[in-house]
Every structure is written in C-alpha cells, then in structure tokens.
C-alpha cells in the first residue's frame, strides 16, 4: 500500500521537485491530478507534468499536494 505525505512547506516542494517524486493533487474534495511530477514552482503556482504533452498549472492556495511513495 502506498505511503502518502502532505507537502506543507517550501522545503517539501523543493524536495519533490529535485527528486522527481510522484504526487497527487486535490482541489477542494476532488482529485485533479495523480502520478505526476513537479517540473517548476513559484510562490503562487505549481506546474506538473505527467507526460510530454500533459502539463498542468495548479494554484498553491487552492490545491493540496501529496507525495506518494510505493
């Protein structure tokens, strides 16, 4: 069963970016992205990529981010 850890601070996000960790993204109560990696981030936005043509922009304020480890 996978282990899930919430990304809470800048250090968590930087680790996920540098180590290319797979994450899940929730907006409200809805899962909007799963199995994606962070390719860029700033204070307001997290940009994720699942495949070559699947790039998504997520608001840090409106979304919750979770690292998924198997």
Model features per residue range: what roles?
Residues 2-70:
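Conserved RNA-binding domains used in RNP assembly and mRNA/RNA metabolism
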């Amino acid at each position: 069963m996978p282990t899930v850890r919430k990304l809470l601070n800048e250090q968590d996000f930087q680790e996920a970016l540098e180590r290319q960790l797979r994450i899940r993204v929730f907006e409200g109560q809805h899962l909007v992205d799963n199995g994606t990696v962070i390719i860029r981030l700033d204070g307001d936005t997290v940009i994720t990529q699942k495949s070559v043509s699947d790039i998504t922009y997520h608001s840090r304020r409106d979304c919750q981010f979770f690292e998924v480890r198997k």
